[in-house]
Amino acid sequence: MAKVYYDNDVNKEYLKNKKIAVLGYGSQGHAHALNLKDSGYDVVIGVREGQSRTKAEEDGFQAYDVSEAVERADVTVVLMPDEVQQRVFNEEIVPHLKPQSALVFAHGFNVHFGAIKAPDDVDVFLVAPKGPGHLVRREYVKGSAVPALFAVDQDVTGDAKALALNYAHGIGATRAGVIETTFKEETETDLFGEQAVLCGGITKLIHYGFETLTEAGYQPELAYFEVLHEMKLIVDLMYEGGMEKMRHSISNTAEFGDYVSGARVITPEVKENMKQVLADIQSGTFSRQFIEDNNNGFESFKSMRSTQAGHPIEKVGADLRMMMPFINNN
C-alpha cells in the first residue's frame, strides 16, 4: 500500500529562512507561489518579460529573469512546460544554481528520461498536485487541499525528503495527504493515463461513437449529446463515488447495457494495445518522439492538432453549446 504523509508528519523548519524561486507563472506556477507565500515563505518569481511577469508583480511578488531568480534561490522550482525545460535548464538554471540547494519539479518527465541532468551537488525532488493550478489554489484558500505525489531523485544534503514534505505542506497538499512515489512511477503512470485513457483513449472512443451513429443516419446533434455531452454527467458520478456510485445513479437499462456491451467494445485486444503504449513510454520511445518533434518545430504535433480540430463533432458541438449558456456561465 502507498505511504501517505499528512501535516503532522512535516517538520516545518526546513523551508524556514530559505528563498524559493518559482520559475514560471502559469497554471501550477501561480498556485504554488501564492500558496507558499500565504504559508509564510519567501518566494520570488523567475519569468521573462510579459503578461506573466506583470501578473506576478500584481500579485505582490518580486519577479526577475530566470537566471537572476535562480541566483537568489535556495530552492528552485521548475514549473515551465516540459518542452522548454531542457533549454532553460541548461542555459539559465544550471550556471546559477547554488551548491547544496534544491531543485523541485511538478512532473518527472525531463529528469526521468534524461533530458535534464542535475548537478551532483543539489537535492532533486518533485511535488505533483493531482489537480490543475486553479483547483490547487482554490482549495488552499478554502482551508482544504488537493492531494499530491512526492518523490526524491537525488539527496545530497540528507534532507531532501524532509524538504519535499515541507514544500508539499507549503502548498497545502499535506492537509489532504501526499503519497510517496518515484520519478519513474510518477512519470510513466501519468503519461500512460493521459495517452491510453484520459486524453487519447477517451477522445478516440467519442469519435468512433459519433461516427458510428452519424454513419448509420442519425442526426449529428443527437450523436453529440449521447457520446460527448453526457460524458460529463457520468464522469462526475465516478469522480464523486467511483463506478459503484455511477451505476447506482443510472437507470437499470443503462446499467444492464454497461455489463453486456462494454466488453464488446473495449475488448481484450484493447488491453494489449494499452500494454504496448505503456511499453513505448517505459522504453523512452514516446519521450524521444516528443522531444524530436519539438526540436523540429512541433511539425507533426501541429498537423495532428489541426486534423483533430477539423473533426465534424467540433462544429456540431460548437453550435449546440450556443444553446446551453449555463456551460459558459460555469
Swiss-Prot record:
KARI C-terminal knotted domain segment(s): 182-327
Cofactor: Mg(2+)
Protein residues bound to Mg(2+) 1: D190, E194
Binding residues for substrate: S251
Catalytic activity: (2R)-2,3-dihydroxy-3-methylbutanoate + NADP(+) = (2S)-2-acetolactate + NADPH + H(+); (2R,3R)-2,3-dihydroxy-3-methylpentanoate + NADP(+) = (S)-2-ethyl-2-hydroxy-3-oxobutanoate + NADPH + H(+)
UniProt domain KARI N-terminal Rossmann: residue ranges: 2-181
Gene that specifies this protein: ilvC
SUPFAM superfamilies: 6-phosphogluconate dehydrogenase C-terminal domain-like (SSF48179), NAD(P)-binding Rossmann-fold domains (SSF51735)
GO CC annotations on file: cytosol
Cofactor note: Binds 2 magnesium ions per subunit.
One record GO biological process: isoleucine biosynthetic process
Name of this chain's protein: Ketol-acid reductoisomerase (NADP(+))
Residues involved in NADP(+) binding: Y25, G26, S27, Q28, R48, S52, D82, E83, V84, Q85, G133
